[in-house]
Amino acid sequence: MALNLRKNHPLLKIINDSLVDLPTPSNISSWWNFGSLLGVCLTTQIVTGLLLATHYTADTSLAFSSVAHMCRDVQFGWLIRNLHANGASFFFICIYIHIGRGLYYGSYLNKETWNIGVVLLLTLMATAFVGYVLPWGQMSFWGATVITNLFSAIPYIGQTLVEWAWGGFSVDNPTLTRFFALHFLLPFAIAGLTLVHLTFLHETGSNNPLGIPSDCDKIPFHPYYSIKDILGFAMMIALLAALALFSPNLLGDPENFTPANPLATPPHIKPEWYFLFAYAILRSIPNKLGGVLALAASILVLFLIPLLHKSKQRSMTFRPLSQILFWALVANLLILTWVGSQPVEHPFIIIGQLASISYFTIILILFPLASMLENKLLNL
């Protein structure tokens, strides 16, 4: 009998074990679609990004014009640019839902997978930040200036570090060229980390909504989940196309239609919507170093989540107290996102400070307390 190539070929075997014959829990819901959707986002961003890079010029005197030229004179350049810019938003929507899913169902107990996931989030944030600078509009320039300047809060080495990152004494041509280099490189680092993320995931297998071992009831990934994933792909691509075609500038900043001018500061400097929650936490502390530490902590706190798991149950499915806290955390992040987009004045300052305190309180204090209380109430 002939060997089955799919199961025996050195390369096809890897693909087969990851996408075809992968044993998968029979009860995972659509919340498990977002991992593969992130793969689609990454592929889309790399393809559109490569096409944009062929027409882009990383020079302060030409960057803005090269982007304008792309939108006017390159075949479908406007579409490629709009897909790339809005694709970033979909990337973040998917990764935030993916992290929320992991938090709700206790997937973070696969520690290696979770920790690499957090590193992936940090890399994605870095990629999006350096990419936002490339069109060299007003908000690109001032966003880069404000955020890179935060490193100067690091004691002793801060100022040297910032000037080293800038390649001079302000954000200028050397900064733009190195940001382009980084923006080109990092997505491939993300792709590499994704493979490591999946390698660790396939060591343990996927979690499921009940948070219980499912080895006794596994089904093959293909055709059951491959077809389910394709539905997710179609829905996301349809939404991305709708946004890119009907309202491509909905999530952008109008300041970026003005070329960068170091002599004129925009009235409200703010990042893209997906960074606003962290920006609100940064702004809520009236001290530079304190703000930078809070900003870092707002993401790095994810590394602590596996250590703060005190419940005898893995998932929140049967834990109503933790569920209330989880949705309070989601609401809190939405409030932080809204506050981050508002000017620094009353009442937004105090709302931002209260929301920042609640963010850390819910994660670091209330989640473990609720878990221990639930254990007690259920006599576990």
From Swiss-Prot:
Query: GO CC terms on record?
Result: mitochondrial inner membrane; respiratory chain complex III
Q: Does the keyword Transcription apply?
A: no
Subcellular localization(s) per the UniProt record: Mitochondrion inner membrane
**Annotated residues for binding of heme b b566:** 98, 197
Checking SUPFAM superfamilies in the record gives: a domain/subunit of cytochrome bc1 complex (Ubiquinol-cytochrome c reductase), Transmembrane di-heme cytochromes
InterPro entries according to UniProt: Cyt_b/b6_C, Cyt_b/b6_C_sf, Cyt_b/b6_N, Cytb/b6-like_sf, Cytochrome_b, Cytochrome_b_C_euk/bac, Cytochrome_b_N_euk/bac, Di-haem_cyt_TM
UniProt cofactor note: Binds 2 heme b groups non-covalently.
Q: Which UniProt keywords apply?
A: Electron transport, Heme, Iron, Membrane, Metal-binding, Mitochondrion, Mitochondrion inner membrane, Respiratory chain, Transmembrane, Transmembrane helix, Transport, Ubiquinone
Question: Which superkingdom, per the lineage?
Answer: Eukaryota
> Residues that bind heme b b562, according to the entry?
84, 183
> Which Gene3D superfamilies does the record cross-reference, listed alphabetically?
Cytochrome Bc1 Complex, Chain C (1.20.810.10)
**Role noted for this protein:** Component of the ubiquinol-cytochrome c reductase complex (complex III or cytochrome b-c1 complex) that is part of the mitochondrial respiratory chain. The b-c1 complex mediates electron transfer from ubiquinol to cytochrome c. Contributes to the generation of a proton gradient across the mitochondrial membrane that is then used for ATP synthesis.
- The name of this protein is Cytochrome b
Taxonomy-wise, where does this protein's organism fall, top ranks first? Eukaryota, Metazoa, Chordata, Craniata, Vertebrata
Q: Which gene encodes it?
A: MT-CYB
